[in-house]
Amino acid sequence: MARFIFITGGVVSSLGKGLASAALGALLQARGFSVRLRKLDPYLNVDPGTMSPFEHGEVFVTDDGAETDLDLGHYERFTGVPASKTDSISSGRIYTNVLEKERRGDYLGKTIQVIPHVTNEIKDFINIGEDDVDFMLCEIGGTVGDIEGLPFFEAIRQFSQDKARGQCIFMHLTLLPFIKASGELKTKPTQHSVKELRSIGLAPDILVCRSEGPIPEKEREKLALFCNVRPDSVIAAQDLSSIYTAPLAYHREGLDQAVLDAFGITPAPKPNLSIWEDVADRINNPEGVVKVAIVGKYTQLEDAYKSIAEALTHGGMANRVKVEIEWVDAETFEREDPAPHLQGFHAILVPGGFGERGTEGKIKAAEFARTRKVPYLGICLGMQMAVIEAARNLAQLDDAGSEEFDHEAGKKRFTPVVYHLKEWVQGNHKVERKVGDDKGGTMRLGAYDAVLTEGSRVAEAYGTTAIEERHRHRYEVDTKYRDALEEKGLIFSGMSPDGALPEIVEVKDHPWFIGVQFHPELKSKPFEPHPLFRDFVRAAKENSRLV
């Protein structure tokens, strides 16, 4: 039976609850325990799948096709435990479930209320799989005091009462601001945050305090006194140069020991942190630097491409180099020469995205990489842009484009080498879609198999010809142009098992030019870099010696 750790936040948002949860999960694993991490988001969207990247950051897709919060990416990267649909939920999904049950008559005519019906739905979600792991870590999104979060805070209060004494603990993450004028860390915001938490029936067992530096003993004792926690349960979460040193930093602060003490687990198994020591060594001691341009649409918000940035870091670790990322707005050279914007980079990556804005710039970036022999990785839309570029400039199909852009404009302007995907095979059944369907949850989502061409660069990278990768797209490259493109050197080196859907293209006689329809960044980890990112950074490293 699992022990439950509820992670809440106060004072301000974006303090790093997700990272703290992920790091704690990794530390518990290092002591031999099994863990599962969950995110409960109070927003009213059913899931983040239709939210703007500027609003929410990236959407993290699981093997079973759930569109989830980017924090689940941190959970997977730090613990290696694949997330699923049962690891992410929102108020929107909770209320949808409750209302569907009411329509079916499941509540037998009762008046539907937040308590008990909504809170029971939340508790039922938390309980899923409780017998499968030693520890269940549940992060509540937002901050204490948010109106949207009240049903979740009430639900976890009830949940802790429903369970046996000592089966649940609460970890509260707050901010300790440093006032330069007085040279002091201020504890008052944390005291008020804990006061707010206690007013709704929750008392923290552990305080994790985000700060620029260490917490002096005087302030630690003050927090312990006024927030009613043990001094050794006041944990400093200091600013770090890399998130991947967080497990070691939290261990030095005693977070994992404080958790085990709160549960009364003695003697505590000793941790094996060798994996994280190796990760920290690779991060802190690079043997070179490579510069990678990410040519995208949402470059003003780096969280929109969070997993890509992390996967590049993992590729750098594998090659003992630091990857310096430059965010390049694809719109800046839609109507001008891309060379001044892209010269000097050792590799170019074009990520996924939606809509026509910026696509001509991405096509130019693909052309620049192909003609200048610069390593190129195109992901999802980035692969489609590479195919359109090759169709226009190699296969003489001057008006090559995507149906997506025609649908957006409301008129036909392009020969669609990329078309709206209307059917595909998922497991043992066929999925059908049409233009005009609801946006939410209707893409080709989750893990799908692909078959690679023997002797291809991608088969060499993976070390096999059978792979499984995660997808999130509704447009696909049309195979009827395959022969014409392969004749000109754009090889279709990966296909769906039925041969209907192109999964990977690569350019013949190029140092490293690969486009993939899937999202390899979603499966990369610091201790297990994805083979495509490993080899992409290796190619950038080789190119750095030539530039």
From Swiss-Prot:
Residues 1-265 are annotated as: Amidoligase domain. Disulfide bonds: none annotated. Residues 291-546 form the Glutamine amidotransferase type-1 domain. ATP binds at S14, L15, G16, K17, G18, L19, D71. Mg(2+) binds at D71, E139. The keyword Transcription does not apply. GO terms for molecular function: ATP binding; CTP synthase activity; glutaminase activity; identical protein binding; metal ion binding. Coiled coil: none annotated. Belongs to the CTP synthase family. CTPSs have evolved a hybrid strategy for distinguishing between UTP and CTP. The overlapping regions of the product feedback inhibitory and substrate sites recognize a common feature in both compounds, the triphosphate moiety. To differentiate isosteric substrate and product pyrimidine rings, an additional pocket far from the expected kinase/ligase catalytic site, specifically recognizes the cytosine and ribose portions of the product inhibitor. Catalyzes the ATP-dependent amination of UTP to CTP with either L-glutamine or ammonia as the source of nitrogen. Regulates intracellular CTP levels through interactions with the four ribonucleotide triphosphates. HAMAP family: PyrG. This is CTP synthase. The gene is pyrG.
